Curated annotation (Swiss-Prot):
EC numbers on record: 3.1.1.4
Tissues of expression: Expressed by the venom gland.
Family annotation (InterPro entries): PLipase_A2 (IPR001211), PLipase_A2_Asp_AS (IPR033112), PLipase_A2_dom (IPR016090), PLipase_A2_dom_sf (IPR036444), PLipase_A2_His_AS (IPR033113)
Name of protein: Basic phospholipase A2 10
């Protein structure tokens, strides 16, 4: 669920998903075109991961996971829940690896500045 994803982000980055990532760049939040930096690319990959789970309720399904010893571990559950957890885990870890590229200027970045053809495809 989005609430669980927010907890994973906070665990990995020490920043809350809202406001730090909810409307960051062109992909964090509702998605868009042309990722602005590595942080935004993490959100692009997360969007692609969710996009492959068309039969799953990616934003609201509650899954099993644990946060221990600096690691996120996804637990057992339905196929959908396990896949959603993996999408969220990989994205949260990506955001941690991209912390050194995070730019405050991309917080609440206007959609109008995310125009042009897509730079990447899923």
């Amino acid at each position: 669920s989005l609430l669980q994803f927010n907890k994973m982000i906070k665990f990995e980055t020490r920043k809350s998903g809202v406001p730090f990532y909810a409307a960051y760049g062109c992909y964090c939040g509702w998605g868009g075109r042309r990722p602005k930096d590595p942080t935004d690319r993490c959100c692009f990959v997360h969007d692609c991961c969710y996009g492959k789970l068309t039969k799953c309720n990616t934003k609201w399904d509650i899954y099993s996971y644990s946060l221990k010893s600096g690691y996120i571990t996804c637990g057992k559950g339905t196929w959908c829940k396990e896949q959603i957890c993996e999408c969220d885990r990989v994205a949260a870890e990506c955001l941690r690896r991209s912390l050194n590229t995070y730019k405050n200027e991309y917080m609440f970045y206007p959609d109008s500045r995310c125009r042009g053809p897509p730079e990447y495809t899923c």
